[in-house]
Amino acid sequence: MHCLPVLVILLLLIASTPSVDARPKTKDDVPLASFHGADNANRILRTLWNLRGCCEDKTCCFIG
């Protein structure tokens, strides 16, 4: 019970702080997710299907 007021105060302080980027964005900045998101998702799904042994006869494989 002694920690509850401290926790509430910390949460209020964290919520009221302004968000500041460590490095200002330039016009050339592009999020990395746009480069790697689809490739990583396809690779992970393909690996999971291959682990199940499902893609050998292509009857239940939804990728490629």
Swiss-Prot record:
The UniProt record lists the keyword Signal: yes
One of the Pfam families matching this protein, by short name: Chi-conotoxin
Tissue note: Expressed by the venom duct.
UniProt-annotated location(s): Secreted
GO cellular-component term (any): extracellular region
Residue ranges the record assigns to the propeptide: 23-51
Keyword line: Amidation, Cleavage on pair of basic residues, Disulfide bond, Secreted, Signal, Toxin
Modified residues (Isoleucine amide): 63
InterPro entries: T-conotoxin
Molecular-function GO term, any one: toxin activity
PTM comment text: Contains 2 disulfide bonds that can be either 'C1-C3, C2-C4' or 'C1-C4, C2-C3', since these disulfide connectivities have been observed for conotoxins with cysteine framework V (for examples, see AC P0DQQ7 and AC P81755).
Signal peptide region: 1-22
Domain notes per entry: The cysteine framework is V (CC-CC).
Sequence similarity: Belongs to the conotoxin T superfamily.
Protein name: Conotoxin Ts-011
The organism of origin for this protein: Conus tessulatus (Tessellate cone)
